[in-house]
């Protein structure tokens, strides 16, 4: 029995917020701010966006390790945040997130048509998220009401390790019956999500304008001048540079051209691990 390189993609494994739903990834960001505020600790939207893509407990732990935020916490409680304190913030974050997730549940404009086209081309649609299952269940329900149903969903607490570890992406490979990780493309708007795909041995596509890095609504994105948009693209490309995505595109609507190019490269014998 011999190993043969895959010659075309079999699956796209997609993030959720900032990738398929919630243009600008506002749902988790705003709730982090509100959860910390309930402990009288101020966290800005920009600070809250920093670790986006990680599991939510890890996200809060990372925020609490930021020296400026740790100092604000110390001024209120007389100590820097422990893991128990992180859990307390997380336990407040969760019901707030579930309560308000519907506010930011709209599909990214054009995403449904794009994904329909990918399926017509034979791709399976896997998915994973930094949300835990209790939140993902609500996100999935709301997306279905808007016409989007992924073939598989993996929440951050359904594997031993969340992003940037590869476990969630690999769980999709197993569930979808994919025979080679190189026949998968991971699409995400965050650095941890791209690292997840890289570590899983997949092709990776970073979304520059629809997610956390740009942090604008669809209307705000559309209103950017050509000069400002190009400046923001350059800034965000630099943010992703260390995670080495194979492709960077504005939104998921640019994905079909990337899929075609990956299939061309696979047919030539190229593999994602080599680039």
Curated annotation (Swiss-Prot):
Mg(2+) binds at residues 15, 17, 189. The active site is at 15 (nucleophile), 56 (schiff-base intermediate with substrate). Pfam families: Hydrolase. Keywords: Hydrolase, Magnesium, Metal-binding, Schiff base. Its EC number is 3.11.1.1. One of its GO terms (molecular function) is magnesium ion binding. Its cofactor is Mg(2+). Belongs to the HAD-like hydrolase superfamily. PhnX family. This is Phosphonoacetaldehyde hydrolase. The gene is phnX.
